[in-house]
């Protein structure tokens, strides 16, 4: 899959983008990449917090190639603003690690007219991934964060519209949709030069996965216990090192085909068509899928 000459020429300059890079798992992923000497782009909503974290990383890892760019996934316009900032770096992208996510207790509508959880966790993440794809090196990585909660979800006919909001329901639907759409990205789009994988960090001690319902947390813990964010980043680091595509990485050694989530082909086709109909309106011209 790799073009060795192309990769050897560019990989020294290619950046690793981590979304949600300052909190919990994102900060650990960023630190590990910086420790490896990778050029890291911290993609965050709070630039002041990101700059302070970047200074800390540079000091602790002695890696000066750490920088911050503003990214807010709550609207398509702000996603595209971020992509333009990445282009302005004049550097290729080695990996896009889609770590950012949200789990609000209450529903609200995004500036684009979608439920906020669905916009951030699914639609804007898809837009970001497709817009960054043309900037990536041969052998690049797109990593999408899924959740065990995807097994609790089904996608209603009106999705991505949400007719009835529940906290875990919207979150689970966003993660199921993202997992299924990764099949489209890794196979239907034939993105052979870039691998597309999902990672499931398990239930860990982070704010975003605190479901505020003891039953959900207890059930998840019994299925896939991981005690802290350090353990939760293991699947991401494994996916970064793997040449495989179309997989879900879990824990220290588990790896399953994403296609195992494909239970209803009609639902899958509708999801892909509806999602691309929305996303194509906001994609840069050079990122429009063939």
Predicted regions: what is each one?
Residues 19, 93-101, 121, 143-146, ...:
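Rossmann-fold scaffold of SDR-type NAD(P)-dependent oxidoreductases
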Residues 47, 68-84:
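The beta1-alpha1 cofactor-binding region of Rossmann-like NAD(H)/NADP(H)-dependent oxidoreductases
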């Amino acid at each position: 899959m790799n073009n060795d000459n192309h990769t050897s020429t560019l990989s020294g300059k290619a950046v690793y983008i981590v979304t949600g890079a300052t909190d919990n798992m994102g900060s650990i992923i960023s630190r590990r990449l910086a420790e490896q000497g990778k050029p890291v782009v911290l993609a965050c909503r709070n630039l002041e917090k990101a700059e302070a974290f970047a200074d800390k990383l540079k000091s602790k890892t002695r890696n000066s190639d750490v920088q911050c760019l503003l990214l807010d996934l709550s609207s398509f316009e702000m996603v595209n603003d971020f992509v333009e900032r990445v282009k302005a770096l004049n550097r290729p992208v080695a990996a896009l690690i889609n770590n950012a996510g949200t789990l609000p207790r209450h529903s609200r509508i995004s500036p684009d007219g979608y439920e906020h959880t669905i916009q951030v966790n699914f639609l804007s993440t898809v837009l970001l991934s497709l817009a960054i794809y043309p900037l990536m090196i041969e052998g690049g990585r797109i990593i999408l964060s899924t959740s065990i909660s995807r097994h609790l979800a089904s996608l209603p006919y009106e999705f991505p519209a949400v007719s009835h909001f529940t906290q875990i329901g919207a979150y689970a639907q966003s993660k199921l949709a993202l997992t299924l759409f990764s099949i489209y990205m890794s196979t239907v789009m034939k993105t052979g030069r870039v691998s597309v994988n999902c990672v499931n960090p398990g239930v860990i001690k982070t704010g975003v996965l605190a479901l505020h319902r003891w039953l959900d947390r207890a059930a998840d813990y019994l299925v896939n216990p991981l005690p802290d964010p350090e353990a939760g980043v293991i699947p991401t680091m494994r996916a970064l090192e793997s040449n495989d595509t179309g997989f879900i990485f879990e824990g220290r050694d588990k790896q399953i085909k994403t296609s195992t989530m494909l239970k209803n082909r009609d639902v899958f086709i509708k999801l892909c068509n509806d999602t691309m109909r929305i996303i194509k309106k906001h994609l840069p011209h050079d990122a429009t899928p063939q």
